[in-house]
Amino acid sequence: MNSFKNFLKEWGLFLLILSLLALSRIFFWSNVRVEGHSMDPTLADGEILFVVKHLPIDRFDIVVAHEEDGNKDIVKRVIGMPGDTIRYENDKLYINDKETDEPYLADYIKRFKDDKLQSTYSGKGFEGNKGTFFRSIAQKAQAFTVDVNYNTNFSFTVPEGEYLLLGDDRLVSSDSRHVGTFKAKDITGEAKFRLWPITRIGTF
């Protein structure tokens, strides 16, 4: 009995903290690894993000969602809120007929206008067949944001209780244009902080 008391005295606080961390991990936060290039240049392939659960979903949040068809978690940006009409016309976003800026796309839109991202998709991380495939997609596109049929003008009506999610690299992202909108229950958290790599730790 005394040995157990001594154990608790020495390790009790540590075990309590460990238990609280484990419980908070289950209910309040998680981490996720970015897979692929769909969120370039905001988030890069392989980066690890700190994700907070149970936050209200706001437009332009970067969220983690569960894609049922592929049975996987994906990282995308919220563009359409429940009931919205989302329209794109030659890289201009209109939300319920109001033109809305997307500053996070400015860099890649400029590169698209310069050389259709051919230099970008020839750089580090785009070696081999991946780079060839991405360059061919970009060459066919007449705008940076197109639908699945490469139309530059298209629209969505977001059902009530659902959200339209798009990747920041619109040319290569598989998102709501391909798999449809996401229910609130399928959005598991908001990415708030970059944990890895060390050179890019911080918010985005």
Curated annotation (Swiss-Prot):
GO terms for cellular component: plasma membrane. Signal peptide: none annotated. Its EC number is 3.4.21.89. GO terms for biological process: signal peptide processing. It catalyses: Cleavage of hydrophobic, N-terminal signal or leader sequences from secreted and periplasmic proteins. The keyword Transmembrane applies. The keyword Membrane applies. Its main location: membrane. The active site is at 38, 76. InterPro entries: LexA/Signal_pep-like_sf, Pept_S26A_signal_pept_1, Pept_S26A_signal_pept_1_Lys-AS, Pept_S26A_signal_pept_1_Ser-AS, Peptidase_S26. It is found in: Cell membrane. One of its GO terms (molecular function) is serine-type endopeptidase activity. Residues 1-10 are cytoplasmic. It comes from the Bacteria. Keywords: Cell membrane, Hydrolase, Membrane, Protease, Transmembrane, Transmembrane helix. Belongs to the peptidase S26 family. This is Signal peptidase I. It comes from Streptococcus pneumoniae serotype 4 (strain ATCC BAA-334 / TIGR4).
